[in-house]
Regions:
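Catalytic phosphate/metal-binding cores of nucleic-acid and nucleotide-processing enzymes, i.e., regions
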Residues: 2-114
């Protein structure tokens, strides 16, 4: 029984690692795209012990408009804190959402600025 629990834990750990790798790739692709957008200032928010919990992964200001992009894989879900932060950004007049691709970011920017 102990081995089975250990094995399941290892499988879940590996799955999370692979998901993180993919999320990292999505973040890199989005950052690469945002650097081509005229009038865009953006940065990757670093989590961990020195970051602020719940802040979207990517912050951008485009032509004076605030954007917060919480990046997730196809199976990833935002935490309750991330959802609350997105609601606060929206209430303050910014744009914030969960994105899973560069195309979703492109659409959000286009919809917001036009």
């Amino acid at each position: 029984m102990g081995f089975l629990v250990f094995h399941v834990f290892q499988v879940l750990k590996i799955r999370r690692f692979l998901e993180q790798m993919k999320e990292t790739d999505i973040v890199k692709a989005i950052m690469k795209y945002l650097r081509t957008v005229p009038g865009c200032f953006c940065w990757k928010e670093h989590g961990g012990m020195y970051g602020t919990a719940g802040i979207p992964d990517i912050i951008a200001c485009i032509d004076g408009r605030f954007f917060g992009f919480e990046v997730k894989t196809d199976i990833g879900k935002p935490t309750k804190l991330q959802e609350a932060t997105i609601r606060k950004i929206l209430a303050a007049g910014g744009t914030a959402l969960v994105v899973r691709s560069v195309d979703e970011v492109r659409t959000a920017i286009t919809d917001s600025l036009h």
